Amino acid sequence: MTEFKVVHTICPYCGTGCGIDLVVKDGKVVDSHPFKRHPVNEGKVCIKGNYCYEFVHSEDRLTKPLIKKNGEFIEATWDEALDLIAGKLKQYSPDEVAFFSCARGTNEESYALQKFARTVLKTNNVDHCARIUHAPTVVGLGECFGSGAMTNSITDLAQADVLLIYGSNTFEAHPLIARSIVKAKENGTKIIAIDPRTTHTAKMADLHLKLIPGSNIDLINTITNIIIQEGMADEEFIKNRTEGYDELKDVVSKYTLEKTAELSGIPAETILEAARMYGSAENASIMYCLGVTEYTFGVDNVKSCCNLAMVTGNLGRPGTGVNPLRGQNNVQGACDMGALPNVFPGYQKVGEAYERLENLWETADLNREIGLTSPEVLHKAGEQVKFLHIVGEDPMVADADINHVEKALKSLDFFVVQDIFLTETAKLADVVLPAACWAEKDGTFTNSERRVQRIRKAVDAPGDALPDWLIVRKLAEKMGAGEKLNFESASEIFDEMAKVIPQYAGMSFERLGIDGLQWPCKTPEDPGTPILHKEKFLRPNGLGKFTPVEHKDADELIDEEYPLILTTGRIIFHYNSGTMTRRCDSITNEIDENFIEINTEDAKELGIKPGEKVRVSSRRGTVNADARVTENVIKGVVYMSFHFLEEATNKLTNSAYDPVSKTAELKICAVKVEKI
């Protein structure tokens, strides 16, 4: 007899956190539908969410542990694989091992992995892919406001009088958040877009500031200066709720309209109009994404946004705030869980909170030194770092300068990958562990607006695959430390998380229900916090901190040999390394190969016609792509996505990183384009 059931869960792709219902027939997921009354997506879904189930039962799912022998993978039992890993781990010191957690996995899994690293192996060398996207957000917002997360809720963006959309192609990267832009437009909201490309999002704007990549700080400082000079600053807010304003005024006063217009390529009158539009609004909201963070000055870019919002008093109310759109489904949660080298769960600093964590975890001698970030691990691989365990990340496609990544991974003494497919990264591993995907386990995700939501198991994992948290628990048992991770379920882990993480203290699986809760939620009666910083900031003194920032050049500038700026981003059909979306036939039928957007004038000068194959080269590598000749990119700039491993864009990109966040400069490098 045929059996059907419908399981409510959360989409596994971007940080929007859309509610979906999985349709299960005879133990297989056969369809998905948007959840009609979900508070985020309200019964709508994008193409990725609509077909998210299609990869679940792919024939190439990992089903058994694999051990590499003589260059070939051999199927193994869990005991064989975990005994081998545990034996290797016992050979290394805390400084010689490192772990990359997974922003695709659940909160419970990131919590378990970082706890294993810290309590069993005494290392803080724990990181995840926020490092290559929104680590500058965590640092910048944290320093200025006291919390490195979206200040407002997705739905209240539509209440803004002005939306400043900065470095975000929301309609393709976060399509259901883009519905708030549509609603805002219908409500009469004025929209300012800052982007070197004429994206679908920019086409909605009343003003489009087509900046030359690298002129970011100059532009925002100039807008801030105009607002101050023309008397649009909120003096009462500044006086009562901030500190450091005089220093900010001194710095931004040097950024003139004329100089910035020349540097940015934006007409002076357009910059002036944008400043007046934002500065005069009663409620103005800044939305930004990786076009702000993925620079060697990404932290300073974020701080400049904070300065602008505080100068105008646009915080603590609906339709205001500084709102980073987080990339992956649980990148916010992985940060919250302490899958970072400098903080324990709940952003408790490793050098300050160790006694509290030692008491809660019933352990001794937690490492008090800040660990290595993922770029630092790769730079020190084979030297200081001997052992690396990666859970659910594919840096061989997703990271900058993947030739450098490959060299680093091959130099390790021992390398473990835990994933649902044999990815490009997993192919280099000594041991590969088969994991359950999101539809095959229980747990929670935390979306971009700090909403903690339950995911629910719909089907069994294939073969011997296990949830990531259970794999980590079994490894702890092999290390003789099973009591450190003595969990029987995801809900048990969540209960411990609520004791450890102040922002989650009032939450439980039962309280999350269907709608979830937005942190901070500190007591069982607390309804959660849709808007941060209403009466005071989360810094110790309750004040927002102005942090003046100055222009910095990109690490790599154009020259005669490499005369074009390459910038990268997402397209609506695929996600990140394409590991999941490119196994969804309904999506790959739309597009399944890489392309490059090039300005009409640049194409004419190079003799390139639409649809022709071109060779794109940087100082690090070369790839081929189909040319899309268009006015959607400004002259001197080309654009590529990074979803296609066959002609991987990240062979070209630059691994130079922000000195504070260690985030690579994926948004700007120098290239040349040649007709093949």
UniProtKB/Swiss-Prot annotation:
The yes or no answer to whether the keyword Oxidoreductase is present is yes
Q: Which domain of life is it from?
A: Archaea
Identify the keywords attached in UniProt to this record, alphabetized: 4Fe-4S, Iron, Iron-sulfur, Metal-binding, Molybdenum, Oxidoreductase, Selenocysteine, Zinc
Q: What induces it?
A: Expression is induced by formate limitation.
Q: What is the stated purpose of this protein?
A: Catalyzes the oxidation of formate to carbon dioxide, with coenzyme F420 as the electron acceptor. In vitro can also use methyl viologen as electron acceptor.
Subunit field text: Dimer of an alpha (FdhA2) and a beta (FdhB2) subunit.
> Which family does the similarity line name?
Belongs to the prokaryotic molybdopterin-containing oxidoreductase family.
Task: Mention any additional remark.
Answer: The genome of M.maripaludis harbors two sets of genes encoding the F420-dependent formate dehydrogenase (Fdh), fdhA1-fdhB1 (Fdh1 isozyme) and fdhA2-fdhB2 (Fdh2 isozyme). The Fdh1 isozyme is the primary Fdh and the Fdh2 isozyme may not play a major role.
| Name recorded for this polypeptide | F420-dependent formate dehydrogenase 2 subunit alpha
